């Protein structure tokens, strides 16, 4: 999980979702998991 000021999808399987007011990227690849804030 990376926490970044700006989150971007890395591959075509990355999905952007909102969870508890945070923008997150979830993906099949665990290295692509990101959270904003």
Curated annotation (Swiss-Prot):
One of its GO terms (molecular function) is structural constituent of ribosome. It comes from the Bacteria. One of its GO terms (biological process) is translation. Coiled coil: none annotated. One of its GO terms (cellular component) is ribonucleoprotein complex. The keyword Ribonucleoprotein applies. Keywords: Ribonucleoprotein, Ribosomal protein. PROSITE patterns: RIBOSOMAL_L36. Belongs to the bacterial ribosomal protein bL36 family. NCBIfam families: rpmJ_bact. This is Large ribosomal subunit protein bL36. The gene is rpmJ.
């Amino acid at each position: 999980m990376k926490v970044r000021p700006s989150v971007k999808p890395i591959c075509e399987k990355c999905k952007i979702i909102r969870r508890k007011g945070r923008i997150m990227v979830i993906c099949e690849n665990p290295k692509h998991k990101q959270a904003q804030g």
